[in-house]
Amino acid sequence: VTKATEAQKGGSFMSQYSDYGQLKNTFSYSTGKMKDGSAVTAVVSNTNGDGYVDGTYVRANSYFLSYAKDLNKDHMLTFTAIGSPQEHGQRDRMLTPEEVEEYGGKYNKDWGYYNGEMLNQRNNYYHKPQFALNHYWDVNDKTQVASSAYVSVGKGGGSGPLGDYAPTDE
């Protein structure tokens, strides 16, 4: 998947729905290797809906992009970007055996309604994309050299009973 020049030309779409109300749509497309020796592969998805545990949810996107270019018969460059910005509610506290017996395993005591809107005591958000540049060199029939440079930057945080938390640059 990461070497777009090796992918077949074409695309696909897939939609998945869980029994607890989560919908995920995924689209992918690859140009295949074009006449100029380059190729692009992209995959994007979106997930939204309720979580398996009561009072939890997910709102997430994900993306993958790969651009590859054969510079000549011995050298190829690729650029890859991948990431998944997301936000989700969670259950923070473990249930006692008595709570599981009385309310079931999906019970979540960390949420409720406030002014008519769902309020979850614990929410997280996160996005840490990665970007990579790779060079592949076929030195001869027995020797190949691969080199990579990448960067990853991210931001995330969450909320809890003590308020919101997000790291700062200070």
Regions found by a protein language model. Name each.
Residues 1-14, 25-31:
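N-terminal periplasmic accessory domains that precede
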Residues 2-10, 39-48, 102-116:
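Flexible, solvent-exposed coil segments and beta strand-coil junctions
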Residues 17-48, 53-91, 126, 130-139:
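Transmembrane beta-barrel wall of Gram-negative outer-membrane proteins
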Residues 68, 76-136, 159-170:
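Acidic/polar loop-and-plug regions of large Gram-negative outer-membrane beta-barrel proteins
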Residues 147:
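Active-site loops and adjacent core secondary-structure elements that bind or stabilize anionic groups
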Residues 151-153:
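Acidic, polar low-complexity intrinsically disordered regions
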